[in-house]
A protein has these predicted regions:
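Structural beta-sheet core signal
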Residues: 27, 67, 105, 243-245, ...
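Beta-strand->loop->alpha-helix junctions that form or flank phosphate-binding loops
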Residues: 28-31, 120-142, 161-167, 191-195, ...
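Nucleotide phosphate-binding/pyrophosphate-handling subdomain across enzymes
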Residues: 143-144, 148, 152-269
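Helix-to-beta-strand junctions that scaffold the AdoMet/dcAdoMet cofactor pocket
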Residues: 97-98, 237-238, 320
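Phosphate-binding loop of NTP-binding sites
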Residues: 1-107, 111-122, 174, 180-181
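C-terminal helical cap/extension that packs against the catalytic core
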Residues: 144, 261-321
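A glycine-rich beta-strand to alpha-helix segment
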Residues: 310-341
Length: 343
């Protein structure tokens, strides 16, 4: 399961589907999945389900029979030169499939024909309103969870009810459905598997409430992920939406600075923590204050603080009953949410 984002959620959905279908797969997933009590399960059958990350071209070390490509966006620009370079890597990934290979691909990926040039295996597309497998008539319940009509080859095949939030998870579910169908798993098993999937650690994880303030944690650290998470939160009932964002790596922050400012501006209040360096050193002259400055050029809603203690004090002083606070990022920002809740 590959793509710039959505890998962990889609792999987790597929885990539920395969296990519901009485398969005994080996599973390697990039988050804590309650179904298997962790992120790794050793199975006894032929299926090996894993995430495939493009960073450093590591997914080219795999020899898959089935590939899922969820999306292709600019990321890991400390390794790739640009989006074209990333697309070349995904084209090489598709070339790893032989003539009997199966490719599941998002119909919205641009210039798919170029990526698929030379591939002679089976292709199943998925999307919203378009694709071999697609969703129509999408509705959200009072909790923000989606229900939609599933169409396969333009034929209505039933309603799908998800237990997770947001349009991005509809797309993840469609990818999982298409993969399940390609593996000859019954639609009933696919439906039951999806209905049993309640999410994975640090993916729109509702941590709790304090004095009526709901605290959610999410791993989003790319503009596309951030936008999807904010849009999912907007389906919930709330007064104000606050995002506490910890950028991840200097190279990503520098390369996508304006995109970060644009998507974060969709929240009512934005609080910025220092950049989480991860594998990098501060050599690019970029900081979280740069995001704050860009946001505040258009609307005075962003605040930068250098410590978690200052952020916690600010959040608790600004937010009230009925508000939502999302801690967001791939670093240790989740600890802040736990501090706010007193966990």
């Amino acid at each position: 399961v590959s793509g710039t984002h959505g890998k962990t959620s889609t792999t987790s959905m597929l885990s539920h589907i395969l296990i519901e279908a009485k398969k005994d797969p080996t599973i390697s997933v990039g988050g804590m999945l309650p179904l298997i009590g962790g992120n790794l399960k050793i199975g006894k059958e032929e299926f090996f389900l894993t995430e495939a990350c493009e960073y450093t071209n590591s997914f080219l070390e795999l020899s898959p029979n089935v590939e899922v490509i969820l999306n292709i966006e600019a990321d890991h620009l400390d390794f790739f030169k640009d989006l074209d370079d990333i697309r070349k890597s995904f084209k090489k990934f598709i070339a790893k499939l032989d003539d009997n290979g199966i490719l599941i691909i998002n119909e919205k990926i641009s210039n798919k024909e170029e990526l698929l040039d030379g591939f002679s295996g089976k292709v199943y597309s998925f999307g919203l309103g378009k694709g071999y497998v697609n969703a129509k008539n999408i509705n959200y319940d009072f909790e923000g969870k989606a229900e939609f009509d599933l169409y396969v080859e333009d034929k209505f095949t039933g309603k799908i009810k998800l237990s997770v939030y947001g349009e991005h998870n509809i797309l993840n579910a469609l990818a999982a459905i298409a993969t399940g169908m390609a593996l000859d798993i019954s639609l009933e098993d696919i439906k039951r598997g999806l209905e049993g999937y309640g999410g994975v650690h640090r993916r729109f994880e509702i941590k709790g409430t304090v004095k009526g303030l709901t605290v959610i944690d999410d791993y989003a650290h790319h503009p596309g992920e951030i936008e999807a998470t904010i849009e999912a939160a907007k389906k919930l009932k709330y007064k104000r939406l606050c995002v506490v964002f910890q950028p991840h790596t200097y190279s990503r922050t520098k390369a996508l600075l304006e995109d970060f400012a644009r998507v974060l501006s969709k929240a009512d209040l934005v609080v910025l923590a220092d950049i989480y360096a991860a594998r990098e050193k501060d050599t690019l002259g970029v900081s979280s204050k740069d995001i704050e400055t860009l946001i505040n050029k258009k609307s005075q809603k962003a605040y930068y603080f250098p410590t978690f203690d200052e952020i916690e004090s600010f959040v608790l002083s600004k937010l009230d009953k009925g508000d939502i606070c999302i801690t967001m990022g791939a670093g240790d920002i989740y600890k802040l949410g736990e501090d706010i809740l007193g966990i």
